């Protein structure tokens, strides 16, 4: 009976600028099965065909897509929990339970303006489990560091690469597995709710 109630947490995976669901899937599935096997990953193409060249041409076949004509899906994803809290987005669906942000940034941070709907998204700390990937050589690293300050108890995986989806070494996989186990304990037992309690700051 207990086996029947177990399910993997479902994660909506949104690709980057001028990429595609298929490209993101190939990159994420390079991660260890010990990580990906614990998750129900759903990959979607953005609604707009990309204009201009993709940086991935020659590595992955087209077509390529864009999300709302701006750089990264992670920027939007970072703002959604705060936008839900303010009652301006996704009002008819359950609250976002967590975010995993690769090369994320903040609307209103050093490099990005603020759309009207997101103006108060970061007006107070976002109490939503978050895991952030920051690349040492990422041109957007400063934006990612600013974003960390917007979340209560953000978890971080640092990697030596640039603006890219990194492979997970043993240390990164351990952090990722820790985040999954901490964030999704009730998901994997079939409970409808989970209680997020940030750990005490050291």
Residue ranges of predicted features:
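Short beta-strand/loop motif that positions the catalytic acidic residue
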Residues: 125-126, 130-134
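Primarily recognizes the serine-hydrolase "nucleophile elbow" in alpha/beta-hydrolase
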Residues: 72-114
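Acidic catalytic loop of the alpha/beta-hydrolase fold
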Residues: 107-109, 134-141, 163-164
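Catalytic active-site module of serine/aspartate enzymes centered on a nucleophile-bearing elbow/loop
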Residues: 169-202
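Serine-hydrolase catalytic machinery in alpha/beta-hydrolase-like enzymes
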Residues: 2-4, 8-71
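Short alpha-helix in the alpha/beta-hydrolase fold that links the catalytic acid
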Residues: 26-28, 113-118, 140-149
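Catalytic histidine neighborhood in serine/cysteine hydrolases
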Residues: 144-145, 149-166
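Catalytic histidine-centered segment of alpha/beta-hydrolase-like enzymes
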Residues: 50, 162-175
């Amino acid at each position: 009976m207990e086996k029947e109630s177990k399910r993997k947490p479902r994660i909506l995976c949104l690709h980057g600028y001028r990429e595609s669901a298929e490209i993101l899937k190939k990159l994420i599935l390079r991660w260890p099965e010990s990580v990906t096997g614990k998750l129900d990953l759903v990959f979607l193409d953005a609604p707009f065909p990309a204009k201009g060249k993709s940086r991935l041409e020659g590595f992955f076949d087209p077509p390529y897509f864009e999300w709302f004509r701006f750089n990264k899906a992670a920027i939007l994803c970072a703002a959604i929990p705060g936008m839900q809290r303010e009652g301006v987005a996704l009002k008819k669906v359950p609250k976002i339970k967590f975010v995993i942000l690769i090369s994320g940034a903040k609307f209103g941070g050093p490099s990005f303006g603020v759309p009207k709907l997101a103006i108060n998204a970061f007006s107070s700390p976002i109490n939503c489990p978050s895991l952030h990937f920051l690349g040492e050589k990422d041109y957007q690293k400063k934006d990612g560091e600013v974003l960390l300050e917007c979340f209560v108890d953000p978890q971080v995986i640092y990697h030596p690469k640039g603006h890219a989806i990194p492979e997970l070494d043993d240390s990164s996989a351990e952090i990722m597995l820790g985040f999954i186990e901490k964030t999704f304990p009730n998901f994997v037992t079939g409970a409808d709710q989970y209680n997020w309690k940030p750990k005490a700051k050291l």
